[in-house]
């Protein structure tokens, strides 16, 4: 399945400055693997190394505006033409 992935500014150095990229996969996990295959190092910014198979807690990912934390996480199904949005959490004081 081909999807469009919106890349936040903080991750654009991994995609050569591109705001959005194409990726493929039938689950979110497969899409992230495809991103890593094409944009080395990007998955390290998304995945929690202390919890294999889990996203960093400060990374929010949406598939068609639905938060994947409530729709299956990395197992979230992806359909052709879906949009994936990556949003890093922002904190301040």
From Swiss-Prot:
In its thiocarboxylated form (CysO-COSH), is the sulfur donor in the CysM-dependent cysteine biosynthetic pathway. May be of particular importance for cysteine biosynthesis in the persistent phase of M.tuberculosis. The modification 1-thioglycine is found at residue 93. The modification CysO-cysteine adduct is found at residue 93. Thiocarboxylated by MoeZ. PANTHER family: SULFUR CARRIER PROTEIN CYSO, SULFUR CARRIER PROTEIN SLR0821-RELATED. One of its GO terms (biological process) is cysteine biosynthetic process. SUPFAM superfamilies: MoaD/ThiS. Keywords: Amino-acid biosynthesis, Cysteine biosynthesis. Induction: Up-regulated under oxidative stress conditions. The gene is cysO. Pathway: Amino-acid biosynthesis; L-cysteine biosynthesis. Disulfide bonds: none annotated. Belongs to the sulfur carrier protein CysO family. Pfam families: ThiS. GO terms for cellular component: cytosol; protein-containing complex. It comes from Mycobacterium tuberculosis (strain ATCC 25618 / H37Rv). This is Sulfur carrier protein CysO.
